[in-house]
């Protein structure tokens, strides 16, 4: 079987892991790498991500990459604060027939709830080129897709659903992303993620998509933001030393009201230290260990409590995208949702 030829975009914290996965995957061939940092231009992709030389030289020249006529783009770059640019970046490739697997174009999670100015150009480009688009998600994606839907499919009736996502981000180096959540700031200040359209496009659309799966209409969506500091300094990868009194834990609660009651709730809890905000939802799994924990609570005829901890949880984000590439390349053109394609298997070694 011919290998799928892939161009990767982005070599940040997640991108490096994603590019490494592409290099390792025997079903894929890395043929191009788009980078934003001038110091990375001209370097071998393997050198950038800590792998042996590949012969693929990083570039910032999109036209040169377009000429490669690859099967798929694996988009790992951040779109925070640059949504329009990120859309424009991939449109020519979609128009040329190159498929797109992305962790970052969040409006495509459930396009009918995304911002039209970001969704429409992508859909039109895919239609023109006969290409496919799949957003796999960033945190790491499956908890609001296959995992949740499989759980709900095992129940006869449901009264309420609560999803809690918890991450220890002390060793996460994404400074700008954490600033969007208000870390290392005054806890009284509402951060950009809560006050701008960004948060709505990330999570409100997701809740509406889950409501569609439940075949229910959302009557109202409410959001609440909490931030707490600690009384001791914290050493972090993103900020260096975070002083006492600065935001060290954030909790974002988004609730979808259906049938006259709060039926679906999502909470995202991030901590710069595992002992921050002890009064909030926590986990004994991997305590003090970098990773991502998901808890799912379902009340209904068959009540359910599930907790899943991934020690290298953030690494799942690019891995899910890379595993999906062969399926997306072979799928019908258009926008794909996670439930549209089969569960993608890992490599066995």
Question: Where are each of the predicted segments found?
Answer:
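Conserved active-site and cofactor/substrate-binding residues in soluble primary-metabolism enzymes
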Residues: 9, 13, 17, 68, ...
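C-terminal helical cap and adjacent loop that interface with cofactors, partners, or active-site loops
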Residues: 274-275, 282-349
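Active-site-lining helix/loop region of Rossmann-like oxidoreductase modules
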Residues: 9, 153-280, 311, 318
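A short hydrophobic/small-residue beta-strand
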Residues: 99-101
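Rossmann-fold NAD(P)-binding glycine/threonine-rich loop
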Residues: 87, 104-131
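Alpha-helical support elements that line or immediately flank enzyme active sites
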Residues: 142-153
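Gly/Ser/Thr-rich loops at beta-strand to alpha-helix junctions
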Residues: 12-14, 81, 107-110, 114-115, ...
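N-terminal glycine-/serine-/threonine-rich beta1-alpha1-beta2 phosphate-ribose binding loop
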Residues: 1-95
């Amino acid at each position: 079987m011919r290998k799928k030829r892939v161009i990767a975009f982005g070599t940040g914290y997640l991108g490096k892991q994603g590019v490494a996965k592409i290099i390792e995957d025997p079903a894929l061939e890395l043929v191009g790498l788009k980078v934003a940092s001038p110091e990375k231009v001209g370097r071998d992709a393997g050198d950038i991500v800590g792998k042996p030389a590949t012969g693929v030289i990083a570039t910032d020249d999109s036209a040169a990459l377009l000429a490669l006529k690859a099967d798929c783009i694996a988009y790992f770059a951040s779109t925070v604060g640059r949504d329009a640019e990120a859309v424009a970046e991939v449109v020519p490739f979609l128009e040329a027939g190159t498929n797109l697997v992305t962790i970052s174009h969040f409006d495509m999670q459930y396009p009918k709830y995304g911002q039209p100015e970001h969704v429409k150009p992508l859909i039109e480009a895919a239609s023109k080129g006969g290409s496919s688009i799949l957003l796999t998600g960033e945190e790491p994606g499956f908890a609001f897709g296959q995992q949740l839907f499989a759980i709900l499919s095992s129940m006869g009736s449901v009264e309420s659903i609560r999803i809690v996502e918890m991450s220890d981000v002390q060793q996460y180096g994404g400074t700008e992303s954490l600033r969007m959540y208000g870390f290392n700031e005054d806890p009284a200040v509402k951060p950009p993620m809560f006050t701008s359209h960004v948060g709505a496009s990330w999570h409100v659309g997701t809740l509406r998509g889950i409501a569609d799966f439940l075949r229910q209409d959302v009557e109202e969506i409410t959001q609440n933001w909490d931030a707490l500091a600690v009384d001791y300094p914290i050493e972090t990868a993103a900020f260096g030393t975070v002083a006492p009194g600065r935001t060290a834990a954030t909790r974002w609660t988004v609730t979808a009201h259906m049938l006259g009651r709060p039926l679906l709730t999502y909470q995202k809890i991030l901590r710069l230290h595992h002992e921050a905000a002890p009064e909030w939802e926590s986990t004994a799994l991997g305590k003090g260990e970098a990773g991502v924990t998901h808890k799912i609570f379902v009340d209904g005829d068959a009540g359910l409590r599930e907790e899943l901890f991934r020690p290298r949880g953030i690494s799942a984000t690019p891995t899910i995208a890379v595993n999906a590439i062969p399926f997306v390349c072979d799928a019908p053109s258009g926008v794909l949702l996670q439930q549209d394609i089969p569960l993608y298997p890992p490599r066995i070694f």
